[in-house]
Amino acid sequence: MMLSASPNTLAKSSLEEMLESLRQKDECDRPKDMPPALPSRPNSRARLPSARRSLPANFNVSSVMEDQNGSVVSVTPAVEAESERKEEGVKRKEKDLGVKRNSFGSKKMRTGLRSESPYAAEKEEEGVKISIAKVSLVENTEEHNKPESEWNNNVEYFIKKKLRVWCRVSNGQWQLGKIQSTSADTSLVMLSTANVVKVSTEELFPANPDILEGVEDLIQLSYLNEPSVLYNLRVRYLQDVIYSKAGPVLIAVNPFKNVEIYGNDVISAYQKKVMDAPHVYAVADAAYDEMMREEKNQSLIISGESGAGKTETAKFAMQYLAALGGGSCGVEYEILKTTCILEAFGNAKTSRNANSSRFGKLIEIHFSAMGKICGAKLETFLLEKSRVVQLFNGERSYHIFYELCAGASPILKERLKLKTASEYTYLSQSDCLTIAGVDDAQKFHKLLEAFDIVQIPKEHQERAFALLAAVLWLGNVSFRVTDNENHVEVVADEAVANAAMLMGCNTEELMVVLSTRKLQAGTDCIAKKLTLRQATDMRDGIAKFIYANLFDWLVEQINIALEVGKSRTGRSISILDIYGFESFKNNSFEQFCINYANERLQQHFNRHLFKLEQEEYEEDGIDWTKVEFVDNQECLDLIEKKPIGLLSLLDEESNFPKATDLTFANKLKQHLKTNSCFKGERGRAFRVNHYAGEVLYDTNGFLEKNRDPLPADLINLLSSCDCQLLKLFSTKMRGKSQKPLMLSDSTNQTVGTKFKGQLFKLMNKLENTSPHFIRCIKPNSKQLPRVYEEDLVLQQLRCCGVLEVVRISRSGYPTRLTHQEFAGRYGFLLSDKKVAQDPLSVSIAVLKQYDVHPEMYQVGYTKLYLRTGQIGIFEDRRKKVLQGIVGLQKHFRGHLSRAYFQNMRKVTLVLQSYIRGENARRLFDTEAKFHADSVSEASTDELSAVIHLQSAVRGWLARKHFNSMQRQKELRNVATKSKRKAGRRISEDKDIPLEQPQVQPTSMSDLQKRILKSEAALSQKEEENTALREQLRQFEERWSEYDIKMKSMEETWQKQMSSLQMSLAAARKSLAAESITGQAGGRQDTSISPFGYDSEDTMSTGTPGVRTPTNKFTNGNTPELRIRELNGSLNAVNHLAREFDQRRLNFDEDARAIVEVKLGPQATPNGQQQQHPEDEFRRLKLRFETWKKDYKARLRDTKARLHRVDGDKGRHRKWWGKRG
């Protein structure tokens, strides 16, 4: 209910009045055994908005917690209020005591109740329920229930509980120990080594319990202090766990070795959310998810000292984004390969890092609406040009020079006149030509592969290599002093000749430019000889100009290859990898610019994590305890402020021709001595107190490097070179001039001003993104694995403001949404739709429905602020509800689609049936007409074919009869001739004795014997001749009888053949007529689809036709069955016809064989005659009669079946005919 207004409540909003009444009511109803409220971490009272906002009258806030036994109990607002009042009292007493941050007995202390308990409550389940730590439950309970007076003396409490503390020993290291006693400002501490030391109480810091050793996020530490943070990072580092969290900031410690925490398997695990441990992959994944969810550009800002691992971290982030947003175009692979190119041309070995980035880069990766990479854009800042010509001992120039000399092919070396790296002055001056464990030749081959992948043509590659070789040969150009004034001339050797050849200019012109300078005196042009120093600067200036422009041109080519296409949506993730903070023994203009860039990045870091955060809390009226931090704005003012900032004074001095580095140093001391970040030194030196520490600078070379002069004669020489790239560079240089280029002029904009403009442009771009910070830490200065230098790490942590980040993250609200945004995104999750529809009421109702603890959020005037992890709970629930909605919609849409499909299917089938029926009827008419025409033609053709066949058979029979007659005639002639020969032989034998001469009587007996034998042989021959004649007569008689019978048989066969042919023709004509008549008559009332039959002459068995949709009939006899019966009958007719033809052929062949036997009888092997042709003929006739009788019976049956089918067709109508 709503309380009436009173003087005490007039200033309160309606929401506060309602909350107060609910708290009072809960206090009355609170059970006696209610456990004490948990100490709030961070300190928050969930302040509600002022009277401008109001909540529903029925609004109630309650939370849940777990007691010591693990059961869930309710924590009412009254309990929270009582706890808050106790906390306020504790804070007031601690403020009166004056305690240093997390130490004992100091003057100041920024309290957070989290640091007062050695065993603080662990994180809640799902970020909503707070659970008490399961370790030392008894001590935990005692801490919550002990009197407030015990907290007033932390040292006594630690002595009583024998808790561990951190103390700094004489060597500056932190060690664990236990307080033995205390007096005044000193304490006796027993170290873990059993030694007792006396230390200042202010130097004691509480140590965390063992359960918190090596936690992933520093926020989880019960006591937040420098030794605890150092120890936690050290434990993880020695376990090769190099990534930790400090609230929203990822801390990456360089392991200086390969660790097995990368690769496709790990990438897949983070993509699928299987792993959530701190990792650069996790940061990249969070940036990608936020980009897709919020549709806002993201940025990964990687910072740290030189050698801390920024470049490698950036490569791993790009690797993850390439895997996450990889598409079909393959641009992500090109993006990864750009790193290889940029490292070769922009990285070098320094005293602190073997692969130090000597330029800053921002790579902006663009994504399509589907989250796929569609292109990228690369920006670079302040390449260290001086490294091309000047090196400190133990350092190297850019990697590309050494890789080119080591890995170029013999043909390329011959073309570029290349030698080994040791023969070039620019490379050999530092006595460092190689890097341990690095193969420059192999690196060069990988570079060539990267060039091909990024699609830089071979021609452009060779041009770039030619200019690199020209730079190396320029370094070998030497000078000869010609007079006492130290004027010089160029030595004409192979160095200047090769340099001129590679640049595409005349050797003499190059020598003139290197040794003289043209001055304009009125209308006259005077050539002034240069001194050795001036000539050397001119030579080095040309080399630096060529290399710097070549680097910029290479970046342009990469941007062309990675250009974003039409799929650009404005969504992007930028990765910033810039040189780290540097402080060497000798620090010049380059270190000043690098440290200035890091100061600007630190300000961006402070702005987003401290300034904007706390300003927004205060403006929106939420309860907030301000966190102090070190602001570097004063240092930035020292550098940037006009007109007496360091850069402004540098530009002013650079414009004075007679100004020197000493006059510049004096001017700095004169104008900047009041700034606390500046300290003048003797001579040309001065100190700047940067955020990362104090750096001593030497102004030697500041003015010259800031001017970066380039004489007009040099630009004119480059523009006249045959090399296309040099012409391009000179054209760009002319275009950058703000006024017409005169002979003695150089470009006007100074390097410092240009770099400042680039930084401001970079900051503006980063301001329009959601930043994700990665702080890289260098564990030791020797670049050795498993070496942890606490002082070096602590210095970097202080510079990064890690402890302040953790404090503000503990008590901060990283997620903030306007009431409208929160209600619009999560309002549909409400189960109660009766809630007022204003955004604030909806937002509070959602929080109430999911029992979000008041400590986990605050309600501002315009926004809702949530602790870390709370938004993930609402996103998970929203995702589940949306998935359920989508599933329901899917099933409903599926039901509608299936119903629509079934309806369309029914309509389609009806339409198809009508169309198919019409097509079938048209086809039947066409085939019937064609069949009638083909039948008439077929009958004519068949008649002519029969006549032709008969004529052929008759001719064959006539020829056969003629041949048999000829053979008989030949046999008679042979018999006659044999008779005549026998008669002549007999007459000759009778005449022999008459012709013989007289013989002696002694041989008479022999002659008589021979005569008797001859007579006997003659009589025997006569008898055989008589028998043969008789046999011939009998054969002639039998032949005449056979001839008569054969003629009679042929006549009978021909009659029967004609009769069967006539009967078959009549049956076919009758069948065709009946089929045509029945189908034509039933066209409108039958459902049988028309079928066409083969013509009678071919006797085909095919039955083609068109089917129509089937239908159900009451008598169970479907059209399909009747069609099959009709087809069966027609098949039977075809079968009978084929059988008739086959049988006819068989009988013809048998009869022909009988005739052949009759004409030429042969003897069997045993000498007996074969069976007589008459017997064979009788058997053949019997077989023919039997087959004819059976064939006629089957013809009658088939005819009857045809009549029956025709009757069935007449009794049934087509189903669509009935519908009509």
From Swiss-Prot:
Residues 881-910, 904-933, 942-971 form the IQ domain. GO terms for molecular function: actin binding; ATP binding; calmodulin binding; cytoskeletal motor activity. Pfam families: IQ, Myosin_head, SH3_VIII-1_N. It comes from Arabidopsis thaliana (Mouse-ear cress). Residues 213-879 form the Myosin motor domain. Residues 1-12, 997-1006, 1098-1118 have a biased composition (Polar residues). Residues 20-33, 82-95 have a biased composition (Basic and acidic residues). Its main location: other. InterPro entries: IQ_motif_EF-hand-BS (IPR000048), Kinesin_motor_dom_sf (IPR036961), Myosin_head_motor_dom-like (IPR001609), Myosin_N (IPR004009), MYSc_Myo8 (IPR036022), P-loop_NTPase (IPR027417). It comes from the Eukaryota. This is Myosin-2. The gene is VIII-2. It is found in: Cell junction, Plasmodesma; Endosome.
